């Protein structure tokens, strides 16, 4: 992503707003309603670090938005893959309570926001 941001800047010389960056995965909910999605944290952490490095290189980044705050219905995968920081109890056949459960990535990203990206570790 760092290289892509630098190339866009070099070619177009305009500020960049990253509007959608994230990871769809097969999240599993534990019997105690926990979702340990370290893979999402690692993915986003690496991408945010690359964005920070690009900014250091002179790229003007206006903002960064993740793919989705909550799990969503994908036109391709239904509810099989999960995308958000909050798990929604729902599946393709509309079976589920629609209850929401905060994933580990929710708490991590909350800390990222509170520190303005200065704390990416998990």
Q: In which residue ranges do the predicted regions lie?
A:
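Non-catalytic scaffold segments within catalytic domains of secreted glycoside hydrolases
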Residues: 1-122
């Amino acid at each position: 992503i760092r290289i892509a941001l630098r190339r866009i800047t070099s070619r177009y010389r305009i500020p960049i707003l990253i509007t959608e960056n994230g990871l769809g995965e097969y999240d599993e909910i534990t019997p105690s309603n926990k979702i340990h999605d370290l893979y999402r944290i690692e993915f986003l952490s690496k991408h945010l670090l690359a964005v920070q490095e690009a900014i250091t290189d002179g790229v003007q980044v206006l903002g960064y938005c993740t793919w989705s705050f909550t799990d969503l219905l994908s036109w391709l995968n239904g509810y099989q893959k999960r995308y958000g920081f909050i798990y929604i109890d729902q599946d393709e056949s509309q079976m589920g309570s629609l209850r929401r459960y905060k994933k580990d990535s929710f708490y991590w990203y909350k800390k990222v926001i509170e520190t303005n990206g200065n704390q990416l570790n998990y």
